[in-house]
């Protein structure tokens, strides 16, 4: 019975999986994302950046499980994810301040950006890594142009500081999204179609995943 482990503190990713009928064990990685990005250098593509970050998260969680939760590491699949918005030639993670979020939203208003989401899986069998795989999905997000009052009210909620690109599709920010080209679940943080492919390549069916990780 393969346990699914989500290596992320993202409530959005957890919600996507739970709405898809899976209740994963959550183990947060705590990797140093800034150090990893600095190591990649300026030549790294957006797709590579989020993929490498997702891989680092999945591998760190797998290492933690092997050392601290042997019963889980006996048969589990760890999935790590990372999302970033690419617009105006730069990758944007979570804004650090409200002013950063304000400037980002002003640059996005009435335009579109590309949301890159890296997905990485590590399968553990008897405390050993038996499979690794990773891939990136890309989704185009079209933004509305919120009024100054609406933007300030949104920024005051604090939501924009918690998510990559300073926006959500499934939360308060959804009011200011006019369309999505690609997988909506990837915009929330974990793409179900790509995750299904990665899980399948690890030798696990969705039926088995449902059976091993039922909702309470």
UniProtKB/Swiss-Prot annotation:
Active-site residues, as the UniProt record annotates them: 82
UniProt subcellular location: Cytoplasm
Presence of the UniProt keyword Transmembrane helix in the record: no
InterPro entries: ITPase-like_fam, Maf-like
Chief subcellular location: cytoplasm
Molecular function, one GO term: nucleoside triphosphate diphosphatase activity
Assigned keywords, A-Z: Cytoplasm, Hydrolase, Nucleotide metabolism
Cofactors (names): a divalent metal cation
Enzymatic reactions: a ribonucleoside 5'-triphosphate + H2O = a ribonucleoside 5'-phosphate + diphosphate + H(+); a 2'-deoxyribonucleoside 5'-triphosphate + H2O = a 2'-deoxyribonucleoside 5'-phosphate + diphosphate + H(+)
Pfam family, one: Maf
Protein purpose: Nucleoside triphosphate pyrophosphatase. May have a dual role in cell division arrest and in preventing the incorporation of modified nucleotides into cellular nucleic acids.
Official protein name in the record: Nucleoside triphosphate pyrophosphatase
Organism, scientific name: Mycobacterium ulcerans (strain Agy99)
